[in-house]
UniProtKB/Swiss-Prot annotation:
Gene that this sequence comes from: dcd
Keywords: Hydrolase, Nucleotide metabolism, Nucleotide-binding
Biological role stated in the UniProt entry: Catalyzes the deamination of dCTP to dUTP.
Protein name as annotated: dCTP deaminase
The organism of origin for this protein: Shewanella sp. (strain MR-7)
InterPro entries in the cross-refs: dCTP_deaminase, dUTPase-like_sf, dUTPase_trimeric
EC number: 3.5.4.13
Biological or metabolic pathway of the protein: Pyrimidine metabolism; dUMP biosynthesis; dUMP from dCTP (dUTP route): step 1/2
Active-site residues, Swiss-Prot/TrEMBL: E138
UniProt cross-references to SUPFAM superfamilies, sorted A to Z: dUTPase-like
């Protein structure tokens, strides 16, 4: 069952769920807790690659990704990152999240931002049981105007569901977990599949 605001506050107070820095109770509503945008971004560089063969040999896929992805772009507090129409960018939450083996999290974008064309997570909105780290956001601007994104602005909300029991393979214990303990806007690691 989805956790209520009272249960989220209790889970934060007793350390069942850890969000650092801890959100104020004002950031907790009904069934969710707001998360903010961090200051790290990555974009696709101008490139001449005609395509990336996602099912190709791992070294070739990784080499192609390395050619087209930018290094981390740091945006200081108070400044803005501009996401132009039709552009995809990776970013990271300001908060780091730790979940136990019996709770799954879900990230939702804000409706007010979606109404301007901003998709906060293109597809990956599940936060696995056992997750520990910052959450990488997959931004896409489907609107008509560039959007200024500033570090620490409220960007989405997390809600949580308690499972019927702990999972046997929590994310932080899996040997093949590609994004374990991520703290940066980590690019795709599909070559590790």
């Amino acid at each position: 069952m989805r956790l209520t605001d009272i249960e989220i506050e209790q889970a934060l107070d007793n350390g069942t769920i850890v969000i650092e820095p801890r959100p104020s109770n004002d950031a907790i509503s009904g069934v969710s807790v707001d998360v903010r945008l961090g200051g790290q971004f990555r974009v696709f560089k101008d490139h001449t690659a005609p395509f990336i063969d996602l099912s190709g040999p791992s070294p070739e896929v990784q080499a192609a990704l390395d050619r087209v992805m930018s290094e981390i772009i740091e945006i200081p507090d108070g400044e803005a990152f501009f996401l132009h129409p039709g552009e995809l960018a990776l970013a990271v939450t300001y908060e780091s999240v730790t979940l136990p083996a019996d709770i799954v999290g879900w990230l939702d974008g804000r409706s007010s931002l979606a109404r301007l064309g901003l998709m906060v997570h293109v597809t990956a909105h599940r936060i696995d049981p056992g997750w520990q780290g910052k959450i990488v956001l997959e931004f896409y601007n489907s609107g008509k105007l560039p959007l200024a994104l500033r570090p620490r602005m409220t960007i989405g909300a997390l809600n949580f569901e308690r499972l019927s029991g702990p999972v046997a393979r929590p994310y932080n214990k899996r040997k093949n977990a590609k994004y374990k303990d991520q703290q940066d806007a980590v690019a795709s690691r599909i070559s590790q599949d």
